[in-house]
């Protein structure tokens, strides 16, 4: 479902799928990166920072039927056009002795890979919207645009929310 091999597998307490929604913990405390192919991605992603009452929504161009995207894994490529359209990077210390670059996290999108003739072009649009407001107003936006409510976003990585399947 998700490519989490960029910096090694992402632990379960930082990456979770629930009801067709992928949750990735972007707190700048653990170096990791995930990606989605165009077959699995949607044209909208988001993040929520409850400490600042800030909802970030990214809407981007995701052309139908296009599957060739540059493979950005840091290795020699067997399939250089089998890449991800959507990535999220979470900064953090790479090891116990090296400080992080930030800390920060990113929501990234890519245009399709295209062998363009001279003077030819393609267009890729990436729009980032930052919404600040009351929890009720932001919750309405999150439900409408992301299909998930803020209480779910806030609770998904709580220890109690990661119980066994029988709970």
Language model features by range: what are they?
Residues 143-167:
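Short peripheral tails and domain-boundary helices/loops at the edges of structured domains
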Residues 120-133:
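Short, hydrophobic/aromatic-enriched beta-strand segments in well-ordered soluble domains
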Residues 1-121, 139-143, 161:
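A contiguous, surface-exposed recognition patch within enzymatic or periplasmic domains that forms
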Residues 136:
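Extended, histidine- and acidic-residue-enriched regions that form the cofactor-binding/catalytic faces
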């Amino acid at each position: 479902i998700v490519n989490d091999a960029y910096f090694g597998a992402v632990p379960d307490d930082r990456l979770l799928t629930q009801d067709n929604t992928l949750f990735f913990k972007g707190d700048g405390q653990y170096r990791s990166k995930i990606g989605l192919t165009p077959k699995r991605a949607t044209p909208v992603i988001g993040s929520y920072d409850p400490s600042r009452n800030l909802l970030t929504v990214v809407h981007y161009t995701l052309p139908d039927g296009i599957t060739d995207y540059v493979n950005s894994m840091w290795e020699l490529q067997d399939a250089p056009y089998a890449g991800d359209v959507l990535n999220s990077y979470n900064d953090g210390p790479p090891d116990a002795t090296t400080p992080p670059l930030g800390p920060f996290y990113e929501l990234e999108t890519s245009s399709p890979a295209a062998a363009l003739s001279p003077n030819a072009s393609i267009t890729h649009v990436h729009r980032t919207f930052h919404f600040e407001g009351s929890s009720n107003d932001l919750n309405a936006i999150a439900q409408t645009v992301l299909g998930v409510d803020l209480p779910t976003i806030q609770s998904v990585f709580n220890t109690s929310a990661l119980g066994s399947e029988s709970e």
